[in-house]
Amino acid sequence: MPRTIGLMSGTSLDGVDAAWLETDGETVTAFGPSLSIPYDPALRRDLRVILDLASGLTQGDARLVSAEARLTEYHIQAVNALERPADLIGFHAQTILHQPDRRRTWQIGDAARLARETGVAPQAEQR
């Protein structure tokens, strides 16, 4: 049964939650540790600004690049703090823009870096 780590960060911007479990994608056969790592106030502030400005930002915006790097670091810390081997990480990243009526959504988070620094392949870009 695949060992997985699920990561969650929401628009509350309070931090990243992580949970380890064994599942085939339909049935959970074992639950492991879980944790929350709160974002520092500066990252929380910067993410709020990005949420407010997202519709006018470009991918190369320095504020966005900086926030994405810091946000990814929190996700890496969460995976490593669980101290459990995993075969897969569920990583939806941080939503900064969601306009379903316009078929538009944007998440930030560096899945390639998450894979490199944890040694575990993430399932990303789920939207």
Give the predicted meaning of each segment.
Residues 1-127:
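Short acidic/glycine-rich loops and adjacent helix/strand connectors
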